[in-house]
């Protein structure tokens, strides 16, 4: 048994799925599966995740795509209405929607969240995003100007304060620079504590998360380097030390698995060979538009040309046993609560994960309840 495996058996890891609310999931490749988003597809994915004992699903919000030959993310559902539908057809799994905070006032989001809390019987939470892609908001006349890049988290801090006040007390009178509440009311309030996710990686994003959020989502890094994200978690730990709050990190990985390492690697190489250069170039241009937030933002990593075919998220490529062992290593990084997974082929990938990968994971023994064979 490796040291990582020994550690993993004593540390349970939560696992969620980043469901494909946009076309083609997270692969900017002509050689990857091509599909449109639909409620039916996301329902099947979410029910499979629930069936296999996974802990949560999250949907993003994307209001304008990257174009290219694959029309990457040009076709997207809306996050809250999708999750409301999923809340009605599931029974156990937790559900997180993403709020585009430049579009939706916080009092409206607080009420929508309370409604889905009612539909789901307390299984709903919220991911807050500031908005980094100017064309998403400029097309609606809602872009506040490029100076916003440097003040995104000041805006989001007031937004989160309004949410917390309404959820916890049913009333907000916040008088801020961006929001002015006047005896704003919310009832009914959520029956369960409403959890907030943030995915900010900049210093300002980390400070916000440590102050207002419950979970921080970050990108994994590299191919089959499952602990390379550790410096990001360390920065959150430093931010948490200033606020004294309990905030755990969740790491985004793409899983590309097959019966053998060689077969999985062949799929990965095939996807890379079909990379949609036009869509990737557009992503790079959008990432360069923010000259105020520093070099450590999510969009900087997404637009890096190293592995832009899957927006540079951490990638786990290998046999089912290889991927299980790599995932067990993730939880060895202190401060890590779990992972958020995407798959090249979501339906098959989830079934393979549930039946062939998860049973081999020491960090998921609390779900499988099985005595595990040694993984080489």
Swiss-Prot record:
UniProt-annotated binding residues for FMN: 61-62, 127, 136, 152-153, 202
UniProt EC number: 1.14.99.46
Molecular-function GO terms, alphabetical: alkanesulfonate monooxygenase activity; uracil oxygenase activity
InterPro entries with a match to the protein in the record: Luciferase-like_dom, Luciferase-like_sf, Pyrimidine_monooxygenase_RutA, SsuD_RutA_monooxygenase
Pfam families, per the entry: Bac_luciferase
Swiss-Prot/TrEMBL keywords: Flavoprotein, FMN, Monooxygenase, NADP, Oxidoreductase
Superkingdom to which the source organism belongs: Bacteria
Catalytic activity: uracil + FMNH2 + NADH + O2 = (Z)-3-ureidoacrylate + FMN + NAD(+) + H2O + H(+); thymine + FMNH2 + NADH + O2 = (Z)-2-methylureidoacrylate + FMN + NAD(+) + H2O + H(+)
Example of a GO biological process term: uracil catabolic process
Reported function: The FMN-N(5)-oxide reacts spontaneously with NADH to produce FMN. Requires the flavin reductase RutF to regenerate FMN in vivo.
Family according to the record: Belongs to the NtaA/SnaA/DszA monooxygenase family. RutA subfamily.
Listed name of the protein: Pyrimidine monooxygenase RutA
Gene name as annotated: rutA
């Amino acid at each position: 048994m490796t040291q990582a495996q020994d550690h993993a058996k004593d540390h349970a890891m939560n696992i969620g799925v980043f469901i494909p609310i946009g076309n083609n999931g997270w692969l900017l490749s002509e050689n990857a599966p091509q599909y449109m988003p639909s409620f039916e597809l996301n329902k099947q994915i979410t029910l499979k995740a629930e069936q296999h004992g996974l802990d949560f699903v999250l949907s993003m919000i994307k209001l304008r795509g990257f174009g290219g030959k694959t029309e990457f993310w040009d076709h997207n559902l809306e996050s809250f209405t999708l999750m409301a539908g999923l809340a009605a057809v599931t029974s156990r799994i937790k559900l997180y929607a993403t709020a585009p905070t430049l579009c939706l006032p916080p009092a409206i989001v607080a009420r929508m969240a309370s409604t889905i809390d009612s539909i789901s019987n307390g299984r709903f939470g919220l991911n807050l995003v500031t908005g980094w892609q100017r064309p998403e908001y400029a097309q609606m006349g809602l872009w506040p100007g490029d100076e916003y890049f440097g003040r995104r988290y000041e805006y989001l801090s007031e937004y989160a304060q309004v949410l917390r006040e309404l959820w916890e007390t049913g009333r907000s009178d916040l008088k801020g620079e961006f929001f002015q509440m006047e005896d704003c009311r919310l009832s009914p309030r959520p029956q369960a504590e409403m959890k907030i996710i943030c995915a900010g990686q900049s210093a300002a994003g980390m400070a916000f998360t440590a102050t207002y959020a419950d979970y921080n989502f970050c990108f994994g890094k590299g191919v089959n380097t499952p602990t390379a994200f550790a410096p990001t978690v360390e920065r959150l730990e430093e931010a948490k030390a200033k606020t004294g709050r309990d905030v755990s990190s969740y790491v985004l990985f793409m899983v590309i698995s097959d019966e053998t390492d060689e077969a999985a690697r062949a799929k990965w190489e095939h996807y890379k060979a079909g990379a949609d250069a036009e869509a990737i170039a557009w992503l790079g241009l959008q990432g360069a538009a923010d000259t105020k937030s520093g070099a450590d933002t999510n969009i900087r990593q997404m637009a890096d040309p190293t592995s832009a075919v899957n927006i540079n998220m951490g990638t786990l490529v290998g046999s089912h046993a290889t991927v299980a062992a790599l995932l067990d290593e993730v939880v060895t990084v202190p401060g890590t609560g779990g992972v958020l997974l995407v798959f090249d082929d979501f339906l098959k990938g989830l079934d393979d994960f549930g039946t062939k990968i998860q049973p081999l994971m020491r960090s998921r023994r609390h779900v499988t309840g099985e005595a595990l064979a040694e993984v080489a």
